[in-house]
Structures are given as C-alpha cells and as structure tokens.
C-alpha cells in the first residue's frame, strides 16, 4: 500500500470535518469530489451555494455529499462576527469590520468555523499565499499550548528509495520561517520529530543540516546550526538528534560512517532540518522535481488546531493528500 493510502485509511478510521474555503478554484472542487468518493473526511465548502454547484457541474464534479456554507446567508455568521470582534477588540476591530472580513474573506470564515468547533480543521492555499493562509490562523486560533513557534514542514515520499523511512522524510522548515535563530531551529526540530512520529508512525531520527559536517567548515551559518543542535539535545534528551551534517552524511550510511563516525544519527536520518527557508524550499522542490517525490505540504505545526497550507502549484490529488494528513492531525487532538 502506498504511504498516502495508509494516511487515507487512518483518516477514514475516525472521520473529521475539514473546511475547504477556496471554492473558486476548480482543483478544490475536483479534490472535494475525490475526498467524498473515498470517504476520507466530511467537507464544508465555503461560498455562494449556487455558484459553487454551478462550477462543480461545469467541471463534472460530484460534491453533493459536501455541506456548502454561504457566509452571506448562514445563521451562524452573526455569532462568528461577535466572536471575531471579541478576539480582535484589542486591535480595535469593530463589528462592521468583522462583518466585512467574514463576508468577503472566506479563509477567515473557515478559520472561525474551526475556532467555534463547527469544523475540525481547514486546508487552503491553492490560490492564496502562505501568509494569507496563516494570518487568520495566528490571529484567531493562536499557538498550541506550550508552543512558542509555528513552523511548517513537507512530508516527502521518495519512490524506490533506500534512505529515510523507506523513502519517507519530513523536511522542516520548508515553508514558513525565513531565517530561524538557534532557539527557533531547535524548536522546529522538536516539532518536526513529533510530526514525523504521528504521520509515519516510526521513530524520528533528526539531522540538523548544514554545508558542514562536524566542523568540516567554519562560518557563522555553521555556528548557528551547531548551537541549535546543542539546544535541541538539551531540550529533548531522549530524541535521536545530531548535527551538523551535510545531506549525504545525514542519510547515506557509508558517508555518515566516514564523515561522522560514532554518531547515532549519521546515515540514518528521516527528519531533515534545514538551516533556513531558502535551503528548505529548494531542497523539497529538488526532491519533488528531480527524484519524482510526492511532496505534501507545507503542513503547519504549532497552531492550536490543524490548519494546513498548499503550494499554489498543487494538484487536486495533492489537496486530497493534505486533507487526509489534516484529518490525522485532528485525530491526534481527540
């Protein structure tokens, strides 16, 4: 069974309700059709009911099993307006402003549904930037208790791969934090390890990546990773984590044994922590395009309730996969 099929089966074991607010995008409607046919999740589509149904019919998609919520007519909208004003009153939000936002920005409406318990999670980003997707989450849902940093990872599945967990990796942070400091990098490592264990159901082995392996190069950028590794080890003494490593030393056993003999992580890593967003973003796209890897994400970690982003280049199948992943994250909060 393919990895994403395992995730789908786990999603089906305890059905969750997921909001898809980007109903103006045909990929969303195609994904909704597939999700409903496969029984992966209950769906809420946000938008004008007539317009959504018309678009679905034009695309040949069956969304009859989804709930369509129109903010302009829903009986719950006023309650969302009142709650949004309450949450943002320190920022000076008025009822008029809250109404304007919720009637016209469906991402905010979807997040309010999650906040109020009318949905378990949300997936968006097919036609919005990561910033647009995550802004309402940070304003409304806030961070998970005990978490200071929201970060993002990609779940990477490389076909016919002997490395990682049979080709399964988590790449973090590949979608959100531009240039994390050592403390933030350590937090990203801990969160990514937790996400790997939840989704892959194997023990995480975390490599802190650099252009240096165990002091082979000297630079301030290397020092940052060395310090992050030290902090992460102190904060997570039971976690298999080490660094700094070049990529080959992290995942190839023979190279790891040569460059970092005695390391419990070298050559065995399945969670790869990149030093900055440039490296992480380039890394996941290289794996996706050159190694034909499946890349699901950016999946967020650290938000109080599961809300996930999509690449704007995503396919309908990518959306299906991220909805399944989001459902599994929701199950973990039960």
Question: What are the roles of these predicted feature ranges?
Answer:
Residues 1-266, 271-334:
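Anion-binding alpha/beta catalytic cores of soluble intermediary-metabolism enzymes, centered on
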């Amino acid at each position: 069974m393919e990895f994403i099929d395992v995730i789908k089966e786990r999603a089906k074991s305890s059905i969750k309700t997921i909001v898809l607010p980007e109903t103006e995008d045909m990929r969303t409607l195609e994904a909704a059709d597939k999700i409903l046919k496969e029984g992966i999740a209950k769906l809420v589509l946000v938008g004008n009911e007539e317009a959504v149904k018309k678009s679905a019919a034009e695309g040949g998609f069956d969304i009859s099993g989804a709930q369509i919520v129109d903010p302009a007519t829903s009986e719950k909208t006023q309650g969302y307006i009142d709650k949004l004003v309450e949450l943002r009153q320190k920022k000076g939000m008025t009822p008029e402003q809250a109404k304007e936002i919720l009637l016209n920005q469906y991402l905010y409406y979807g997040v309010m549904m999650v906040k109020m318990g009318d949905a378990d999670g949300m997936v968006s980003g097919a036609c919005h930037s990561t910033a647009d997707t995550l802004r309402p989450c940070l304003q409304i849902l806030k961070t998970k208790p005990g978490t200071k940093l929201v970060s993002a990872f990609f779940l990477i599945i490389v076909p016919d791969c002997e490395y990682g967990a049979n080709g399964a990796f988590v790449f973090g942070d590949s979608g959100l934090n531009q240039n994390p400091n050592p403390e933030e990098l350590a937090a990203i490592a801990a969160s990514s390890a937790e996400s790997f264990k939840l989704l892959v159901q194997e023990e995480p082995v975390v490599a802190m990546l650099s252009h240096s392996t165990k002091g082979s190069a000297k630079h301030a950028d290397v020092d940052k990773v060395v310090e992050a590794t030290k902090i992460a080890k102190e904060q997570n003494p039971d976690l298999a984590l080490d660094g700094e490593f070049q990529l080959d030393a992290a995942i190839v056993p023979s190279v790891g044994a040569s460059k970092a003999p005695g390391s419990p992580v070298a050559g065995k890593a399945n969670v790869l922590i990149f030093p900055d967003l440039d490296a992480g973003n380039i890394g996941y796209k290289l794996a996706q395009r050159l190694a034909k890897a499946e890349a699901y994400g950016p999946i967020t970690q650290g938000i109080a309730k599961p809300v996930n982003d999509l690449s704007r280049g995503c396919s309908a199948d990518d959306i299906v996969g991220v909805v399944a992943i989001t459902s599994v994250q929701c199950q973990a909060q039960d």
